[in-house]
Amino acid sequence: MKIVECVNLNKTYRQGQVTVQALRDLSLQIDKGEFLAVAGPSGSGKTTLLNMIGGLDEIDSGSICVDGKTLEVMSQAQLADLRLHKIGFVFQAYNLIPVLSAIENVEYVMLLQGLPAGERREKARTVLDDVGLKGKYNRRPAELSGGQQQRVAVARAIVSSPAIVLADEPTANLDSKTGQGLLEMMQAMNTEKRITFIFSTHDRMVMEYARRLVKLKDGRLVDDEFKSNSAHS
């Protein structure tokens, strides 16, 4: 079952007099439950592709369908609702709210969804336990290591069991041991909960864990490999 379908995507950014074509006629289908990495050099279009799948960037031309919804015909309010209920984001820089504790950061999405306080707290505790942060519920981001902050970010992304998690360079600021632990945790969630994970990455380890590796160059899809020997699959 397709959960993402991109057809002939084009995206151009303009910075002053400079025009950069980030995506060029890119087409890609992703099935529910995939664990997929998008690789390529800087400027190849990886982050742009994730942002467009997440409805954060407008499409110049082409079409994107996510979980049965055609993004280019949706209003900003409809896109925000899709992100809130169907898509989890993990950012390279964590993007945690510094004045909130770990558990409050995780609860925030559910607060926007209108869940009762007791249910929010129970779900947030459970998912923080799942990512190895039991007992650190009340720590603020500045009191956590980089690896712990990224685990809070993952917990926030998956607490509502989204259909898709989009992870932009999730291991870039982590040492190899912490990065491996994070990947194993997300791989387990993919297997157990059937959450679709889509990564953008330069990290060879992420590519090794992925069950499918898509490569971009100059905004074009240049390779698409399904792997039978991904790490710990």
Which sequence ranges carry the predicted segments?
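ABC family nucleotide-binding domain
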Residues: 2-216
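ABC-family P-loop ATPase nucleotide-binding domain
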Residues: 1-12, 223-233
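H-loop (His-switch) and adjacent beta-strand-loop-beta switch element
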Residues: 213-226
